[in-house]
Amino acid sequence: MVRILIVEDQKIMQKYFEYIIMQEPEFRHVQTVSDAREAVKICDYSAIDLVIMDVQTFHNHDGLSAGKEIREKYPYTKVLIVTSL
């Protein structure tokens, strides 16, 4: 079971990622948040296998910095950085 955290501030993209995750029986959607700092906090108390993170989230928090922090603290957690142009 792959536990997934979605970090995305746009509701339509949140729903899209949640829908995709639900299609795969091996995936388990743990939580969706709109803030990169909140994602780091969640990783502090939840065993997350994969973080799907927007490069720039609500309040302009930097997804790259948060992703790097998660990878340093939890090396077995994979971080997928996404963006839309």
Which stretches of residues belong to each language-model region?
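Acidic, metal-coordinating helix/loop segments flanking the phosphotransfer/catalytic sites
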Residues: 32-50, 58
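His-Asp phosphorelay/catalytic-motif detector in bacterial-type signaling
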Residues: 2, 47-49, 73-78
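Conserved phosphotransfer microenvironments
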Residues: 54-67
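Conserved acidic carboxylate
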Residues: 8
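Non-catalytic signal-transmission and effector/linker regions of two-component phosphorelay proteins
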Residues: 1-3, 12
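Amphipathic alpha1 helix at the N-terminus of the CheY-like receiver
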Residues: 12-23
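Short amphipathic alpha-helix used as the core "switch/output" element in two-component signaling
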Residues: 41, 64-76
